[in-house]
Design a protein with these regions (language model features):
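Short hydrophobic/aromatic beta-strand micro-patches
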Residues: 2, 138-140
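Structural detector for hydrophobic anchor residues on beta-strands
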Residues: 118-120, 135, 144
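Phosphate-handling catalytic interfaces
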Residues: 1-119
Length: 208
């Protein structure tokens, strides 16, 4: 960040921007001046799509180590001096969750919430064989769950074996599971169709 009344920084692989900053938009971290988490999230609204903007907001709100709060983000949106991205910010705010653990979970959750399917509960706590577990996205009424399988779930042998065991335990407890990977983030309609089939098979009769 540069002092006021100076030109935007120019350097290789760096794009400088000039912006109007409100009091509280600038914070210091380790001796470096930065825009605050809330102001940065607002600025990202001009370049990210809705799903990724929600994912960024979810990361700020993550309940185990929150960087911000919904109230502070709402205040930042209200004070934001530019119209760029404002519509997207306002669409994103009611979709934010403090319980989405990762970007893929957030993206799939946004797809589910903005479709005609019921809203899932992120990181829903269940007990499988007496052990506390969490299902990434869950419909407890219908016992339908969605789980993200990142690449580390494949390359880490212990993780892979644990995933299979937990998946089987969930089925034994009556859950119908939908698994998705990074590739599915580029084909979300398939995830929605699979989820809808599971829900209808468990008694969901559609929106309304």
């Amino acid at each position: 960040m540069s002092p006021p009344h100076t030109r935007a920084t120019k350097a290789r692989n760096v794009v400088g921007h000039c912006a109007t900053l409100n009091p509280g938009d600038v914070v210091e971290r380790y001796g470096v001046l930065l825009t605050s988490a809330e102001r940065t999230w607002c600025d990202l609204a001009a370049i990210l799509d809705l799903s990724d903007l929600v994912a960024a907001g979810d990361a700020l709100l993550w309940h185990e180590d929150p960087v911000s709060s919904l109230a502070r983000l709402q205040d930042a949106v209200a004070r934001y001096p530019s119209q760029r991205g404002r519509v997207r910010m306002r669409l994103a705010l009611p979709l934010l969750s403090a319980h989405s653990r990762s970007r893929p979970e957030s993206i799939v959750r946004v797809a589910l919430v903005t479709s005609e399917l019921p809203d899932p509960i992120p990181n829903f706590e269940v007990f499988l064989r007496g052990v506390r577990r969490e299902i990434d996205l869950a419909y407890p009424r219908y016992k339908v769950g969605l789980e993200y399988q990142g690449d580390h779930h494949r390359t880490d042998r212990a993780q892979w074996r644990g995933d299979i065991r937990r998946g089987n335990d969930a089925v034994d407890e009556g859950w119908s599971m939908v698994y998705f990977t990074g590739d599915d983030l580029h084909n979300l309609p398939d995830v929605l169709r699979r989820t809808e089939r599971r829900l209808r098979g468990r008694g969901w009769t559609g929106p309304g």
